[in-house]
């Protein structure tokens, strides 16, 4: 399966970190134990990572934007400390009842990133734990991986035939092991 990618897009909650619901403070944010090891394996396929995350907790008043910024700073520090190339973190505050095309499954955050970093989206991979992560990847011609951590187990049977993920794995680590073979 080993292939080089321009970039690997990552969902945040349920993909690289434990998702207890809305994470409103830095002390509530916990990477999965396997996240760094998995990302270290994936960097053999690219060392360009971008996190794309819906963060409607801001619109709902459940998290302050300044607390989200602290969480993002921590994520950048951890990626840097582990020599993982995190290019950027894109997030959308939109409430699901009033979404713009930036909110996943909209594609705008991916398009913004591809323009800023000159990425060929057809040579990128999206990894997430919901159908809302996979759908924009399919629309944009990207490869996609559903991880069953987080919400993945709930979503794995909810795909139309043409929108199915290219890969389904129990978690990011098992997906990384298979992809680098």
Give each language-model segment a name.
Residues 72-91, 157-180:
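Structural recognition of alpha->loop->beta junctions
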Residues 126-167:
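Acidic, Mg2+-coordinating phosphoryl-transfer loop and its flanking beta/alpha structural elements
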Residues 1-50:
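Active-site neighborhood of HAD-like aspartate-dependent phosphohydrolases
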Residues 20, 25, 57-62, 95-100, ...:
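A short acidic, helix-capping loop that chelates divalent metal ions and anchors anionic groups
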């Amino acid at each position: 399966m080993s292939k080089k990618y321009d970039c690997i897009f990552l969902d945040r909650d349920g993909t690289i970190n434990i998702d207890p619901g809305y994470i409103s403070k830095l002390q509530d944010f916990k990477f999965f134990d396997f996240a760094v090891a998995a990302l270290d394996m994936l960097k053999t396929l690219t060392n360009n990572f971008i996190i794309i995350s819906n963060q409607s907790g801001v619109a709902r008043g459940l998290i302050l934007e300044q607390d989200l910024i602290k969480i993002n700073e921590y994520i950048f520090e951890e990626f840097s400390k582990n020599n993982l190339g995190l290019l950027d973190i894109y997030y959308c505050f939109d409430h699901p009842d009033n979404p713009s095309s930036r909110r996943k499954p909209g594609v705008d955050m991916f398009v913004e990133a591809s323009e800023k970093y000159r990425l060929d989206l057809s040579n990128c991979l999206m990894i997430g734990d919901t159908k809302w992560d996979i759908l924009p990847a399919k629309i944009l011609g990207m490869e996609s991986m559903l991880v069953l951590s987080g919400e993945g187990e709930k979503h794995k049977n909810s795909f139309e035939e043409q929108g199915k993920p290219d890969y389904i794995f129990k978690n990011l680590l098992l997906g990384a092991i298979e992809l680098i073979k």
